[in-house]
Amino acid sequence: VELEQLLERAHSLGEEGNWELMADLLREHLSDFQDEPAVHCWLGVAEHELGLEGVAYERFKRAITLEPEDPYVLATAGNGIAAFDDEDAERVLRTAALTAPGLPLTRLMYGAYLSREGFHEQAQAELDAARALEPEDPQIAYELGVARALGGDIDGAADAVADSVQLDPEDGWARVVFGLLLLEVGRGDEMVGELISGARIRETDVDAQLGAALAAASTRRDEVAYEMLERARLNASEADLVLVADVEDRLDSAEASLQMLSEDLGPDLLRTRLQERP
C-alpha cells in the first residue's frame, strides 16, 4: 500500500468515528512507514480517541522527533503533547502557525494552547486570525470563547460560544459551557435551556446531568430535574455519589438549587471545562 492511500483510508475511518479500525489499519502498516511522521501522528489521534492517552503521547512524540514539515502533523502532534504539559508543545505549535499562517488549524491549535497557558492577548490574536480564515468553524468560535473567558471577558466569551452552538447545535460540550457562561453573566432563563439541551446530548456526562438537574429545579421543572438526577446516578462512579446526593438534597427548593448551581457546582464546572484542551 502506498503512503497516500494509507493516510486517505485512515482519515476516512476517522471522519466516520471508526477509531478502532483506523488504529488497527495504521498499526498494521507501521513497520512499513517507521520514518513517516504522519503515520505516527494519525495513529496517535486514533489511540487518543480510544482512551489510550499514554500510548498516543508516545506516537505524537515520535512524529515530532521525525521532524515533520506538514503543518497538519505539526499542529496535531503539538496539541497532542500539550495535554501532557510537554515543554516542546509551544515550539511545535508556534512553528506550525508561523510556517502555515493561512491554515486555520495551525492558528486554532496555537491559540488554544496559548489561552490555557495564560497568554490571553496572544491567544485571542491567533484565534481571531483563525476565525477570519474559517468563520463557519464551530471549534474556532468555541476556542475564541474559551480564550475570552480565561482572559476575564465573560460577556465576550458567551457571545463567541453562542456562535459555536449556532454553528453546531449537536455539540453537547459547547452547549453545557454556553449554559455555564450564561449563568455567570446573569442570563438565567437562557441558561436553563442550554444546560438541559447539553445534558441530553451528553447522556453519560455526570456533571452535565447534575448541572441540568439544578437548573431545572431552580425554575421548578421538577420532572426534568429528577430525570437528570437519575441519569447522573446511573452513570456515576463511586466517587461521584456524594455529589449526586448533595444535589438531590437541594432539588426540593428552587432557591437552594440555584444557590448550589451559582456558587458551587457551576463555577467549578466552568473552570475545569475551560481548561480542557481540544
Predicted regions and their residues:
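Canonical tetratricopeptide repeat
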Residues: W42, T76-A77, M109, E143, ...
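Terminal, low-structured helical/coil segments at or just beyond the last alpha-helical repeat
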Residues: N235-P278
